[in-house]
Regions:
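Right-handed beta-helix
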Residues: 1-5
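Short, small-residue-biased leader/transition segments that mark boundaries at the very start
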Residues: 6-19
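Active-site acidic carboxylates
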Residues: 23-114, 135, 169, 178, ...
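Active-site-proximal beta-strand/loop segments in catalytic clefts of secreted hydrolases
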Residues: 71-74, 118, 146, 173-174
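Internal catalytic-core helix/loop-beta-alpha segment
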Residues: 96-150
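Short, small-residue-enriched loops and turns at beta-alpha junctions
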Residues: 122-123, 175-179
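Metal-ion/cofactor- or nucleotide/acyl-coenzyme-handling active-site neighborhoods
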Residues: 142-143, 158-161, 178
């Protein structure tokens, strides 16, 4: 993979073909960047807390010594007819809209295709992590992104259930919730479930 600086186009690998940037012994580290999309940052469901974590997430990706995966919340035009749409009647992350796009400064760092997901937790992501671990043992999986209390907690718990012997880490400084209170509640819930919270 490479970034063409002349056109800013990214030539991407599939997730499973992604090679770790470097390894600790024979073990690889994984960073999962959850739903860092415009609608969750300063769009339809944006918050000032989400805006505030963007520089830290960018730095985390740039300095991460391992494989970086991205998830992308993806809804269709009939979103309001879905169960989620009925409970949260705010159209967001509709496929091919500006709000659906990963934040540009983060997307420029992406080296694999995003894992699109229609709901909070991604079984595709969990399956990808299991497959990666079978190919080359994973030392740790770190989660950052949005929202702490919805999609971060859902995917961190799926990873914990799928790979119970792999340390799961959430970088609290690089996450934001729907509210500061729900962010803290989610961190506490994950900690009870033996997920490491880095503050």
């Amino acid at each position: 993979f490479f970034i063409d600086t002349a056109t800013s186009d990214i030539n991407t690998l599939s997730h499973h073909d992604a090679l770790p940037i470097s390894r600790d012994g024979n073990m690889q580290k994984v960073l999962v960047v959850v739903d860092m999309q415009n609608d969750f940052i300063d769009g339809a469901l944006g918050t000032k807390e989400a805006v505030a974590i963007v520089p830290g997430v960018k730095e985390k990706i740039e300095n991460f010594d391992g494989v970086v995966l991205f998830t992308r919340d993806t809804h269709e035009t009939y979103y309001l007819d879905t169960q989620e749409g009925q409970k949260l009647p705010v159209p967001h992350c509709i496929r091919d809209t500006e709000g659906w796009q990963i934040r540009s400064e983060l997307d420029a760092l992406r080296k694999t295709e995003p894992i699109d997901k229609e709901t909070f937790g991604s079984t595709d992501l969990a399956g990808e992590l299991v497959a990666m671990n079978e190919d080359n043992e994973i030392k740790s999986i770190t989660f950052v992104g949005l929202c702490t209390d919805i999609c971060v907690i859902s995917n961190a718990l799926l990873a914990k259930a799928s790979l119970p012997e792999v340390p799961i880490i959430v970088d609290a400084k690089c996450c934001a919730g729907v509210t500061p209170e729900s962010h803290e509640n989610a961190l506490k819930a994950m900690e009870v479930c033996q997920i490491q919270i880095d503050r």
